[in-house]
């Protein structure tokens, strides 16, 4: 699939604008995050947009704001999910404007690894309480997501619930998947894109980072470079994994230099050596 692009896709979300306060005294969270302040607006020119960056860089905050502004439940699920277990989302969605194209998604889902358990619980609860119509679980492979492993339930959701012409927002989906199953997810994403879907994804996965034709934004806390468009190979994530895999043992030795020294030289041995050395000084 190298070199294969999907630029012809018409996205529902064309652009997102964040109304950053002009008054610096109002620069509290989430506007205290450099990436939120600097991005201003995000244009979506590809059906797959990826946000990557270190923990705390603002990936999930931005993705969550877009999802909630688009009408999704902050904790995840389709637009029909209304459950709430804990109000932890930021208020950035209130200052988020979504510019939509003429295309309208026929389906949609906001998937968060951290609250996927709550989504699965809500599906089971609705099936128990709503007696009329087909059971919801039939759209998820016919088996409760709680009766599958985390990775199995995630892929079951994508394989059975997601269809073409959808808007799908994933917050760190790799948390549920092995590297091999991340490749399986990539195949599903590319299939759904060909069927007219749009994906917004935040990730720490070098596998997902390399989805063909994806538009990539790298976030950091570096002033002036907190929100940058780039290629996969230019990201800190890609460069880190490339360097690590070339020389994993050397990286570990450098990282754990002091710990490895202590492993070879237990503290009681070091104390005896220091004691003997000090005695020689005294005599």
Residue positions per predicted region:
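ABC ATPase nucleotide-binding domain signature region
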Residues: 50, 61-128
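The conserved Walker
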Residues: 54-55
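GG-anchored amphipathic helix commonly corresponding to the ABC/SMC/Rad50 NBD signature/C-loop
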Residues: 140, 144, 148-172, 180-192
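Conserved glycine(s) of the Walker
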Residues: 58
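N-terminal pre-Walker A segment at the start of P-loop NTPase domains
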Residues: 4-40
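C-terminal lobe/lid and adjacent interdomain/linker elements of RecA-like ASCE P-loop ATPase modules
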Residues: 180-198, 205-283
């Amino acid at each position: 699939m190298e070199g294969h692009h999907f630029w012809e896709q018409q996205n529902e979300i064309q652009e997102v604008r964040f109304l950053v306060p002009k008054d610096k005294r109002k620069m509290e969270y989430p506007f205290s995050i450099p990436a939120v302040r600097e991005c201003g607006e995000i244009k979506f020119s590809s059906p797959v947009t990826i946000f990557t960056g270190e923990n705390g860089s603002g990936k999930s905050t931005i993705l969550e704001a877009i999802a909630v502004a688009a009408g999704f439940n902050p904790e995840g699920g389709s637009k029909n999910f209304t459950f709430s277990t804990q109000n932890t989302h930021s208020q950035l969605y209130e200052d988020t404007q979504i510019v939509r194209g003429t295309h309208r998604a026929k389906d949609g889902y906001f998937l968060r690894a951290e609250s996927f358990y709550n989504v699965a619980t809500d599906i089971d609860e609705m099936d128990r309480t709503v007696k009329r119509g087909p059971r919801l679980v039939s759209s998820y492979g016919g088996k409760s997501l709680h009766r599958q492993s985390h990775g199995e339930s995630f892929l079951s959701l994508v394989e059975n619930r997601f269809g073409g012409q959808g808007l799908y927002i994933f917050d760190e989906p790799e948390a549920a998947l092995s590297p091999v199953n991340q490749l399986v997810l990539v195949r599903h994403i590319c299939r759904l894109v060909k069927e007219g879907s749009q994906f917004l994804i935040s990730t720490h996965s070098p596998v997902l980072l390399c989805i063909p034709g994806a538009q990539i934004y790298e976030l950091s806390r570096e002033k002036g470079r907190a929100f940058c468009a780039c290629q996969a190979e230019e990201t800190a994530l890609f460069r880190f994994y490339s360097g690590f895999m070339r020389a994993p043992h050397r990286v570990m030795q450098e990282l754990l230099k002091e710990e490895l020294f202590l492993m070879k030289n237990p503290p009681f041995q070091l104390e005896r050596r220091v004691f003997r050395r000090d005695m020689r000084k005294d005599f």
